[in-house]
């Protein structure tokens, strides 16, 4: 645990607009007073928006300042595989929750 906290502290020094939080899929990095970095990634990478408009669109969609979105993007650039793993973990958790809900509905229907 001490090693994890030290690592997080060093990362926060390099990325001061971010903080670590506990969540249903484990520790994750998020903007201070903002969404998790993995949530922003979907609006920044890929999608139907031209690359030169993606930061501005994320600013609009999430109600953030440009420097916040750029801070999240900088963290993602440095720790891409970590954030991609969080995206995947959250996708899997959502699928499992949906499957459970469907099973509950089947049981209720008899």
What do these predicted ranges mean?
Residues 12-18, 22-38:
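Short, Lys/Arg-enriched anionic-surface-contact patches
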Residues 59-71:
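Short, basic interhelical loop/turn and adjoining N-cap
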Residues 10-15, 72-85:
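Short, solvent-exposed alpha-helical "recognition" segments
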Residues 25-34, 88-110:
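Intrinsically disordered, low-complexity basic tails/linkers immediately adjacent to helix-turn-helix/homeobox/MYB/SANT
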Residues 1-7:
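Short amphipathic alpha-helical segments
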Residues 34-51:
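Short, amphipathic alpha-helical "recognition" segments used to contact nucleic acids or chromatin
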Residues 16-21, 82-94:
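Short Lys/Arg-enriched helix C-cap and helix-to-coil transition segments
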Residues 1, 57-60:
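Short alpha-helical "recognition helix" segments of helix-turn-helix
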């Amino acid at each position: 645990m001490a090693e994890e906290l030290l690592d997080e502290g060093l990362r926060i020094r390099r990325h001061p607009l971010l903080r670590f939080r506990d969540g249903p899929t484990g520790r994750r990095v998020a903007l201070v007073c903002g969404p998790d970095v993995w949530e922003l990634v979907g609006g920044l990478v890929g999608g139907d928006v031209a690359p030169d408009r993606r930061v501005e669109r994320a600013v609009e969609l999430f109600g953030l300042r440009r420097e916040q979105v750029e801070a999240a993007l900088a963290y993602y650039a440095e720790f891409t595989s970590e954030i991609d793993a969080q995206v995947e973990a959250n996708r899997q958790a959502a699928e499992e929750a949906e499957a459970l809900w469907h099973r509950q509905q089947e049981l209720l229907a008899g």
